[in-house]
UniProtKB/Swiss-Prot annotation:
Subunit details: Homodimer.
Role description: Catalyzes the attachment of proline to tRNA(Pro) in a two-step reaction: proline is first activated by ATP to form Pro-AMP and then transferred to the acceptor end of tRNA(Pro). As ProRS can inadvertently accommodate and process non-cognate amino acids such as alanine and cysteine, to avoid such errors it has two additional distinct editing activities against alanine. One activity is designated as 'pretransfer' editing and involves the tRNA(Pro)-independent hydrolysis of activated Ala-AMP.
Known EC number: 6.1.1.15
Annotated protein name in UniProt: Proline--tRNA ligase
Keyword set, alphabetical order: Aminoacyl-tRNA synthetase, ATP-binding, Cytoplasm, Ligase, Nucleotide-binding, Protein biosynthesis
Reaction(s) catalysed (UniProt annotation): tRNA(Pro) + L-proline + ATP = L-prolyl-tRNA(Pro) + AMP + diphosphate
Subcellular location: Cytoplasm
Enzyme class: ligase
Protein family per UniProt: Belongs to the class-II aminoacyl-tRNA synthetase family. ProS type 1 subfamily.
Organism whose genome encodes this protein: Bordetella bronchiseptica (strain ATCC BAA-588 / NCTC 13252 / RB50)
Swiss-Prot/TrEMBL GO biological process terms: prolyl-tRNA aminoacylation
Amino acid sequence: MRASKYHLNTLKEAPAEAEIASHQLMTRAGMIRKLAGGIYTYMPLGLKVIRKIEGIVREEMNAAGAIELLMPVVQPAELWMESGRWEQYGAELLRIKDRHQRDFVLQPTSEEVITDIARNEIQSYRQLPLNFYHIQTKFRDERRPRFGLMRGREFTMKDAYSFDRDEAGAQRSYDIMYAAYQRIFQRLGLEFRAVAADTGSIGGSRSHEFQVIADTGEDLIVYNPESDYAANIELAEAPALLATRAAPGQDLEAVPTPGAAKCEDVAKLLDLPLARTIKSIVLAVDQPEGPAQVWLLLLRGDHELNEIKAGKLPGLAGFRFATETEILDHFGCKPGYLGPIKTARPVHVVADRTVANMADFVCGANREDYHYQGANWARDLPEPELVADLRNVVEGDPSPDGKGALSIQRGIEVGHVFFLGTKYSEALKATFLDDNGKPAVLQMGCYGIGVTRIVGAAIEQNHDARGIIWPRAIAPYEVVICPVGWGKSETVRDTALALYEALRARGVDVMLDDRDSRPGVMFAEWELIGVPLRVTVGERGLNEGVVELQARREAEAAKVPVDQALAQTLAKLDLL
């Protein structure tokens, strides 16, 4: 491609609303243009990157035995009602009506449609296993779309769905997709981790996220550098109880703590480590009849509640945070001074594993401006009703596999695999005849990759002050040839054209910048766009018999003889 015949429109400044590097750089590089909140036009450069990602995904899915189809973006509401998600999905599900006032949705996902296909297409165990996939536009009506393609409303995903006759087969399909995802992200040239994850609202019993490592990532990834253990922060298990609890060493005492409503303030006021304090979190679970059940969750002052873990405890499914009225009714005190000793009304008490092992701790006294110091289980209050893992792990916690300490880094979720079991196939009555001629329910798995999200994630991981640094596999162009003096020197033109045609003949995706721009402007623009390798052809260099190769990731350019320019360019590309 020649730049003079292409659409390049880079910007010096990013829009004020662009908060993160990928949004800023994609806009400045002319890859996307905003149409509405969370909705973007993919300009030619951006679309090239997307198509390259799709190509790698498609190749690996096909190689893994998946079969491509294409499901519609607009789906009838009846299917969503049948699965129960018409009401469950919430405001992110964009509901529309046609001219006949029939309800439809713009698909945020395709479990209902693919299960409908399966129940109509799969009759016998002889047709199994099957794995269908598509690459399609999705729409989720995010409350606050932001970060460009990282959290948009309209986006492109690859969805795959496996169907098996039994759970053992479904687990094999899961493993095949897991391995395919490993290959996909390796080929994309991204640093990533596959981490165990919560299944969330989509359901199922086994799940892994594929996270691109980036300092700006919203997710926290917990891993053990000395083993294969890796999990999302929501799922990572905190250490179990120590063998014994220390004996009480202090008397219980109510001490004044005026204005100290946070554990940090209490610890500072009493000159104690924050780890000696206990924070009280009050939850409520609404009941079919009568008032809500009130629960008191206790965590160490320096730990944070993991709401996913809490929601999985017996009796706490569907919890909400208690209202101030409920708190006053059960504790006789406003938040900030709550504790498990002498509550006004009975509450269910759940202690984190760490808290259950504490002695001589500090907790709220259920009296404004007072805390208890020297509190001890059994002596001053009953043992907790339940001891559980309630907290997020922290850096340095022992690894659950017993092989060292945990580390934490940030990541961006770009892929997710789930074993669904029969959640959707039972709801939509997707059955087949087994080898005994009896009806059986299909076992399912689903596997998603955020195609457009990968674009943003790749930039978040690969950029510098000058612009994007694309991995070769997904760069809009692999090489850009920058002739200095295109309009003045026939030798420069001929040399640049010869190299351009030679690279094209060898299948290299190359751009020739024939716009006769000033060198500084031309170089800065291609550094912003992030092409992995630049070849500079100038009259001064040609007089010396050389051209310059500049890898985007490297500080220094290399001079190579003109007659070796093709070979050296190809060799350099192989190293990128």
